[in-house]
Amino acid sequence: MSRGAVLFAFNSPKYNYYSMAEFTAKRINHFLGLPVTLITDESSLPEVPNFKFDNIVLVEPDKNNIRDYVVWINKGRYQAYDYSPYDETILLDTDYVVNSDKLLKTFDLDTDFCCHDTTSFLMHPKAPQEVLSAYSFKTLWATVIMFKKTKRAKHIFECLEMVQKNYEHYANIHSFIAGVYRNDYALTLALRIANGHQLLPSDIIPWNLWHVGKNTSAYADSADEFNTEYTVMFDNWQRGKIRKEYINIKDMDFHVMNKESFMELINE
Amino acid sequence: MDTKNLIIEAKARFNHNSAKAYLKEKYQTRLIVAEQGGLWRANVETITFLSMAKTDKVILIDSFENPVEVNREELLSKLLETYSTVMKEWHQEWSELEKKR
């Protein structure tokens, strides 16, 4: 029984996703003890790599997605099932900072596919959960997915492909904006379709996904490559003024939404 | 990055509520145990029930809402061990946090 992690990384004009993937892969190796397969394209490959991936799969990326006036290459996540060489896979976003072995617990769950349905923001723990639209579902998160090579998992990824290819149709039905393709939204719909239009409790990772949100930055407390202690700082706007607030965290995995903060973190 | 200087220069204030919420979340996760075909939380309620039951085998509803037959003593021992280790660490980190007041 083989286990490993899969990352997708396609450089955009604004961000170097390949170097983000190298940073994340090193931490996956260190904290989870798993090999990492990278799915990328020829143009993202650096001349001097910083990390030796277990496998590199070169694909032709779909660049037909624009976010904040820049190309955002996030389509094609459904290919993870076919390209993963492992029997059991953890599929992660490249901006997920692994600081513990917690994700290994997902392999022990009695399911062949699971993802997060609840998030918490590190400096805003009671923030409301995201929904597709006012009359639709609570969003599932494609940031962390564990899947095993089974017929059902394959079906879920096929549904993900189908939703991606008919995204406008689903956006019309569920009243969300189709302009920017979101893997989270596609997953929310695909998992329900594959499950006969319901959500199974066992498909949900039984802890929350922690975000470092938009007005928040994470700083490593030491220069150690595998540092697990961070200062998280938040710009709290009050009466037209910014009040800086912070907390210290350790041994906790988190997802960085603020890409500038993530780039600072990997360059420290 | 010298984060201590960063905090001083930014005149940042420590946010106790967010820190408490982070600690709770972190340690609640560690209380989760996959054992004997079910998913369990090492909480007071489950531990008390397992301690009070008399039979070797009991049927419990796990976190996925499935009824699972378990060996009572084995599960009790695993949950007690997890509970005591995790709560000790949580208490220690919480005590350090309280000193920041």
Descriptions of predicted regions:
Chain A
Residues 45-84:
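Active-site-proximal specificity loops/subdomain of glycosyltransferases
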Residues 12-21:
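A short, glycine/small-residue-rich beta-strand->loop->alpha-helix junction that serves as a flexible
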Residues 73-124:
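GT-A fold catalytic core of metal-dependent nucleotide-sugar glycosyltransferases
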Residues 39-46, 96-100, 205:
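Short, polar loop motifs at secondary-structure junctions
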